[in-house]
Amino acid sequence: MSIAPWSFSKIKSFEQCPKKFYHLNIAKDYKEPHTEAMRYGTKMHLVAEEYIKNGKPIPPEFAYLNGPLQALERKKGNKLTEIKMGLDDNLDPCGFRDKNVWWRGIADLIIIKDKKAWVIDYKTSKSAEYADKGQLELMAMATFKHFPEIQKINAGLLFVIANKAVKEVYRKEDSGDLWDKWFYKYSRMEIAEKEDVWNARPSGLCKRHCVVLECVHNGSN
C-alpha cells in the first residue's frame, strides 16, 4: 500500500492529527460531515468559474465577488479555471486520475501570459489572518511542471468575503529547494504508514470537532 497520491489537504490533515488522518484516509471508518460552510464554498467556486470561463452573471447572493473577479477578468492572458493537475514521483506531469499519480492539486484560476502566470486560490474564510500559503506554493510548483515555459508566478490566496489577498511570488529556479520541504513532509506520512503508527495529537479541536469517537481525547469520552 502507498500513502500516495497526496495533496496539501492530506498533508495538513496528517500534521493536525495522525490518528484522525488514519481513520479518515486509511481505515476509512469515519467521515467528516459535509457542512453548510463547505457547501457554500463549493457553490462560490462554481459561480467564480462560470463568471471567468463563460461570462455568466454573478448571482446577487455572491455580489461581493464582482469586484475581485472583475479585476481578475481584466488581466490579459489565457485563463484556465479549476485546473486539475497531477505529478508522478519523478515530478513529471501526469493526469489527475492516472495510475502513477503521486501528487494531486486543483488550481482555481491560472492566467498565463508569455513566461509569467498568476495562480489564484479562492477562500471564503472571513479572515486572512492565519492564512497558510502552503497550498499556493504547491500549486505554483505544479504549474511550473505542467507549463514549463513559465518562469515566474504571482500567486495569491483571495479571501473574497474579507476582500483581502495574501500574495507570494515564485520563481522556477527556486522550485528545487521548495520541493525538498514537501518531500520531508511526505516522508513523515510514509514512515507512519510503513510502521503503522498513528499517534493522536491532542488540540483544542478534539472535544467538539473530531469525528473519531473512539479516541480518548474525543469529547464523547
Placement of each model-derived feature along the sequence:
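RecB-family 4Fe-4S metal-dependent nuclease core
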Residues: 1-221
